Amino acid sequence: MLLRKRYRHRPCRLQFLLLLLMLGCVLMMVAMLHPPHHTLHQTVTAQASKHSPEARYRLDFGESQDWVLEAEDEGEEYSPLEGLPPFISLREDQLLVAVALPQARRNQSQGRRGGSYRLIKQPRRQDKEAPKRDWGADEDGEVSEEEELTPFSLDPRGLQEALSARIPLQRALPEVRHPLCLQQHPQDSLPTASVILCFHDEAWSTLLRTVHSILDTVPRAFLKEIILVDDLSQQGQLKSALSEYVARLEGVKLLRSNKRLGAIRARMLGATRATGDVLVFMDAHCECHPGWLEPLLSRIAGDRSRVVSPVIDVIDWKTFQYYPSKDLQRGVLDWKLDFHWEPLPEHVRKALQSPISPIRSPVVPGEVVAMDRHYFQNTGAYDSLMSLRGGENLELSFKAWLCGGSVEILPCSRVGHIYQNQDSHSPLDQEATLRNRVRIAETWLGSFKETFYKHSPEAFSLSKAEKPDCMERLQLQRRLGCRTFHWFLANVYPELYPSEPRPSFSGKLHNTGLGLCADCQAEGDILGCPMVLAPCSDSRQQQYLQHTSRKEIHFGSPQHLCFAVRQEQVILQNCTEEGLAIHQQHWDFQENGMIVHILSGKCMEAVVQENNKDLYLRPCDGKARQQWRFDQINAVDER
């Protein structure tokens, strides 16, 4: 009986052992599939370091920034974060809304999280590095040269956004630097840089292409951080999706403003959060060459009062093709306070020690500019009362030159910039730019502001309607011991010094017969541009002309170009003060509306050929297409 009972219980024991064995296997599988959090984080971080494009840089940014603080309800206004002091005139409620939080503060931040915020966990990095692609590649998913030329619809900023979205976020630009630049080796002890990108409803592709271009071209030893400042964008893709994308990028921070600041004050917001030695303000639609940052840092390290800029190349807003600047140029201005590029004068070119020597520039371009962070703050930063954007580069340049600093363009630093379609600029932007120019004139030009108002009647009218309050900036000038604008004209840009009275006629040049206006529609270098007729537009600087007391017709911007004649076609050439060429640039504007070329005795006529409406010299016969009129300019002598 006992033996029979033993055999009866043996199958039960075997079943129990098998059950324990199966349970153990299940627990082992669960442990393998779901490791502890710290083990998983170490594994993912190791894989990301192995495969990420940034792994080749010399130093690490430190602990990765895994969290982005963001509003739970994107429709609500953001609230400021605590512990962040205000800067100049920006109130705290205008400042912060989202920052990348270091991993070391993650638990503390989670404990303080309020009901209106949430923490977004950093997604896993991709295991494979995104390949860099060249122009015109024909692989699947890439854009060939023929496809780049295919027309796409424009977005509100005049950008081919659909085409841009098809171009890789990481692509190699053609090498356009001077061979001597490639022989330069940066110092190991350069200052660090904070690159600040401000955007408002920027295209997703151009924004991130700018970010990746910086990360791919700058050694980590020199890049402290990239700070993205969202100036109240409304596009949904630039909200949570951007926060989550930025959380994957080491060294990239995201700030959000709860009010529309404009590019000028948004840059100031980014500057308050920057920790690098040097501030680099860059538009959010740029692409950088390798080695673009090191020359900027090196020049600032040699003199902390230098304001420096790279050579700005052109990325076509229609095709996204890259067009490098061929000749050395400097940034200048005219009496309407318009910025433009000018080929280096012969005496400046001869003074350069080499083709890669720094270029003294009267004005720095606004697209990319770098300066010492403490110098920027101690000299008053940007003018916080300027609206939106426009003219901030002039104010920065005048302040540098007149208050003990200098402005340079560095040929070995190259950055491509998308110059968006001018016609896409809103009337609000144009009004803000005009208002900013009035502030600059009242603050920095002194008695020469009268010359500005003579060249810009609309600015004169605005200054009479609303007198700007410039007391704070004038006090800043006295505190810094700044020089007068006369010193700038005598020592920095003597070519600008006014040498003649107000032009006899100015404004748009209307053709009576066709109802159109004289225009130059060339892109890029406009030297030799044939003059044509186009629909009249108050916003096109290319239609602003001046008939001077020397019988010249000056192109509005840049003003060093004049109407000339080549094979009886009216074109733009450099204004000439001596020699035979000057006679090709003399025009008599008669009371009957005809414009007579004095040397030939012929009249300027609008000639229609197929789809073109060009300007040619023809025998004077008084026909409607030879009748012209300039805009009427209100007198400003009573000021």
Swiss-Prot record:
Region feature (Catalytic subdomain A): 190-299
Known catalytic reactions: L-seryl-[protein] + UDP-N-acetyl-alpha-D-galactosamine = a 3-O-[N-acetyl-alpha-D-galactosaminyl]-L-seryl-[protein] + UDP + H(+); L-threonyl-[protein] + UDP-N-acetyl-alpha-D-galactosamine = a 3-O-[N-acetyl-alpha-D-galactosaminyl]-L-threonyl-[protein] + UDP + H(+)
Record membrane topology: Single-pass type II membrane protein
Residues that coordinate or bind Mn(2+): D283, H285, H417
Transmembrane segments: 12-34
InterPro entries: GalNAc-T, Glyco_trans_2-like, Nucleotide-diphossugar_trans, Ricin_B-like_lectins, Ricin_B_lectin
Residues carrying sugar: N107, N574
Binding sites annotated in the UniProt record for substrate: D231, R260
SUPFAM superfamilies linked to this entry: Nucleotide-diphospho-sugar transferases, Ricin B-like lectins
One GO cellular component term noted in the UniProt record for this chain: Golgi apparatus
PROSITE patterns named among the record's database cross-references: RICIN_B_LECTIN
The entry's keywords: Disulfide bond, Glycoprotein, Glycosyltransferase, Golgi apparatus, Lectin, Manganese, Membrane, Metal-binding, Signal-anchor, Transferase, Transmembrane, Transmembrane helix
Location of the region described as Catalytic subdomain B in the Swiss-Prot/TrEMBL record: 358-420
Sequence similarity: Belongs to the glycosyltransferase 2 family. GalNAc-T subfamily.
Task performed by this protein: Catalyzes the initial reaction in O-linked oligosaccharide biosynthesis, the transfer of an N-acetyl-D-galactosamine residue to a serine or threonine residue on the protein receptor. Although it displays a much weaker activity toward all substrates tested compared to GALNT2, it is able to transfer up to seven GalNAc residues to the Muc5AC peptide, suggesting that it can fill vicinal Thr/Ser residues in cooperation with other GALNT proteins. Prefers Muc1a as substrate.
PANTHER family, sorted: N-ACETYLGALACTOSAMINYLTRANSFERASE, POLYPEPTIDE N-ACETYLGALACTOSAMINYLTRANSFERASE 15
Protein name per UniProt: Polypeptide N-acetylgalactosaminyltransferase 15
Lineage: Eukaryota, Metazoa, Chordata, Craniata, Vertebrata
